[in-house]
Amino acid sequence: MAVFTPVTLDDLSQWITQFDLGKALAIKGIPSGIENTNFFITTEFGEYVLTIFENLSFEQLPFYLNLMRHLAERGVLVPAPIATHQGNLINALHGKPAAIVSKLEGSSQMEPQAVHCAAVGAMLARMHIAAENFPIRQPNLRGLAWRNETAPIVMPYLSDSNKQLLAEEMAFQNAFAESDTYHQLQNGPIHADLFRNNVMFSGDHLTGFFDFYFAGCDTWLFDVAVTVNDWCIDVETGVLDQERVRAMLDAYHHVRPFTAAEQAAWQTMLRAGALRFWLSRLYDFHLPRDAEMLTPHDPGHFERILRLRIEQATPPLFTSAG
């Protein structure tokens, strides 16, 4: 992600001695993203990813790292956290919590086709099933409570039309969260940020999901909605690509069949996914933090997506024949 906390090779060389990874040979900052500080590091034993957590606390982090370990042990393709000689997954670096995980093979597929969307859908369903019995419960930290806190903060920066959009959508989502349909939705640990740049492919072969540091317990359908809103759209307009949507949803449904309640909530959850990222991008755009290599995202992208999900009918979650 962006480099908020610089780390030199000398810093790394001293810190890494607590791991069984050999000597540090190289370190390179990763510029994409705006939440944590990430580096590619090379040691005598191979390549890894070092993350320094800028917002999450030492107390919150066991959820994320142990979830990744839990998933990996059950055949879900995710990075493996690396423990120190003492068995610790989380260790202080420059006074902040930090962790090392294995580096996945391949690269992100930024122009996905239906075959890639199907692979992501199937793996996402397997991830939800595998995580269902994960013993640690931690809420989605960008869930409805966070949205209710953040909306008033960004509201003064908005145009009149966007103020109206945000106020109306917040009211809509808060009302839905009180409904019987919402309370029937299946839930558990979710990734919550499964964008194209958080999945690796080697050709058409999916090699793993990564960056689980927005994960939390929420509805599985929200996770599907966030994923569809990124993988299955025309990036210029935000319009859903029907072929890619169908490929992702059908592949997911084949592994973990959707429910009638999820079908009823589908369009609402697509709106919720768009709202969550519109709010976070508005916050980061108007209230940025200092960082090297910072690359803020355009809030207008998810404003467009939210308006589309409100105005246009969406493909069904599943068909009666599915």
From Swiss-Prot:
Question: In what pathway does it function?
Answer: Amino-acid biosynthesis; L-threonine biosynthesis; L-threonine from L-aspartate: step 4/5
A GO molecular function held by the record: ATP binding
SUPFAM superfamilies per the UniProt record, alphabetical: Protein kinase-like (PK-like)
Q: Which domain of life is it from?
A: Bacteria
- Swiss-Prot/TrEMBL catalytic activity: L-homoserine + ATP = O-phospho-L-homoserine + ADP + H(+)
EC code: 2.7.1.39
Please tell me whether the keyword Thylakoid is annotated for this protein: no
Alphabetically sorted, this entry's keywords are: Amino-acid biosynthesis, ATP-binding, Kinase, Nucleotide-binding, Threonine biosynthesis, Transferase
- Coiled-coil-forming residues are none
Q: Which GO terms describe its biological process?
A: threonine biosynthetic process
CDD domains recorded for this chain?
HomoserineK_II (cd05153)
Disulfide bonds, which pairs?
none
NCBIfam families assigned: PRK05231.1 (NF003558), thrB_alt (TIGR00938)
Which family would the database say this protein is a member of?
Belongs to the pseudomonas-type ThrB family.
Q: What is this protein called?
A: Homoserine kinase
Organism of origin is: Janthinobacterium sp. (strain Marseille)
